[in-house]
UniProtKB/Swiss-Prot annotation:
Organism, scientific name: Mycobacterium sp. (strain KMS)
Function, in words: Binds to the 23S rRNA.
Gene: rplI
GO MF: rRNA binding; structural constituent of ribosome
Entry protein name: Large ribosomal subunit protein bL9
Pfam families noted in UniProt: Ribosomal_L9_C, Ribosomal_L9_N
Keyword Ribonucleoprotein: yes
GO terms for biological process, alphabetical: translation
Cited NCBIfam families: L9
GO cellular component: ribonucleoprotein complex; ribosome
Gene3D superfamilies with a match to the protein in the record: Ribosomal protein L9, C-terminal domain, Ribosomal protein L9, N-terminal domain
């Protein structure tokens, strides 16, 4: 059975792709859930529109990611004040991706999603300067220097 996908399906394809599947899989799973439509001339035109929209969205997303990367690289060092032991310099708790996003926003940087921030380890648990990477788009990654200091 020849179908055109209207949504992303794992191990099969993305919206707008024309795929060949077994009849039962198409009739019992893809078509009832609205994940695909039967391939025809009109449906092929619709698939071309979906594909063009997806490509345009990818290009716009890449341009936006590059703008955010430029804004992040313009920041020298982002400073984050946290509760820490005066003797050992160890933190009471840890610095998470949410804390990093708030510090970047406070330093005048762009508003980011916490899921884009990749910490060197799961959490930062010591004072000092740490390099944090931000994944903005597939292929576009920015690096931010984060200086963790003790609150006074």
């Amino acid at each position: 059975m020849k179908l055109i996908l209207t949504a992303e399906v794992d191990h099969l394809g993305e919206p707008g792709d024309t795929v060949e599947v077994k009849d039962g899989y198409g009739r019992n799973y893809l078509l009832p859930r609205g994940l695909a439509i039967v391939a025809s001339r009109g449906a092929q035109r619709q698939a071309d529109d979906i594909r063009r929209a997806r490509e345009l969205k990818t290009v716009k997303g890449l341009e936006h990611a590059n703008e955010i990367k430029t804004a992040l690289e313009a920041l020298d060092t982002v400073e984050l004040a946290v509760n820490a032991s005066a003797d050992t310099g160890k933190l009471f708790g840890s610095v998470t991706a949410t804390d990093v996003v708030a510090a970047i926003k406070k330093a005048g940087g762009p508003n980011l999603d916490k899921r884009t921030v990749a910490l060197p380890k799961a959490h930062i648990k010591s004072l000092g300067t740490h390099s944090v990477s931000v994944r903005l788009h597939p292929g576009v990654e920015a690096s931010v220097s984060l200086n963790v200091v003790a609150e006074s």
